[in-house]
């Protein structure tokens, strides 16, 4: 007598691509499987969604050989319901916003600067907000770990993923900013009252208190200048991150593949005007220009001594801002990169490829 065992999901009918088939050795009258084996087969071979109960069919086929007549094989099948050990799932193929607080189900994207961070900025009305997640064909919800859906405005909230939604209560209409950190399992929602603001810089031209004082909001347009631009001024539009308007991202792919490299600084303006729109003039009768502007660049060697530093590709480095002569004459040697990211809140710079 020879025995063959088969294991499969109940509805697979012991298909050739799904069944676990074993031809048992002589004298073997039992078959066991470890929890790890069943879990791996469920996930990889049978594509059972994580944390879903499923039913297995186990079949034994006994075949008789060597007698004077043919004997039909005996077949016995039993069914077993398996409840997997619960796995703490926190991943996503797609993240959206839904609920009565938003006009329609809206997919939200990862930020360019941080692949673990989803961000969204837009209009919400009074109502309930949910965060549905699609993962391996199943729908889950990102919910507060403590089950409390009250808006904790601007605060970090620990979250988890469940099959049942818990809604955040949006108490007033307006533009909200929502951040989901998939690595730290935290959500932060900013209302209009607590929302992050763009950087605004107030300075005296050239840093001399006797020169006019100006205020420049940093909304995305910067002026590149240095050997890398041929000592000409390049007006470049950086895109404020959805996560924080003080994170400015230049994506070469959105600018016909144009990449800026070489020694350069990032100035706030190339010219200055008064309240009537007239150019601000120096004592020599010439207008103030980019060379007198506040700029972002590498740290100077000292408060009075400039320097030039190579910016390593793929490494977050220190960004310095100022208007002194030492700062205005210091330059980062920027490598060719797909992305150039200036974090003005934390004063860092990163050039990296996608």
Task: Show where each model-derived region lies.
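Insoluble glucan recognition modules
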Residues: 1-6, 13-17, 24-354
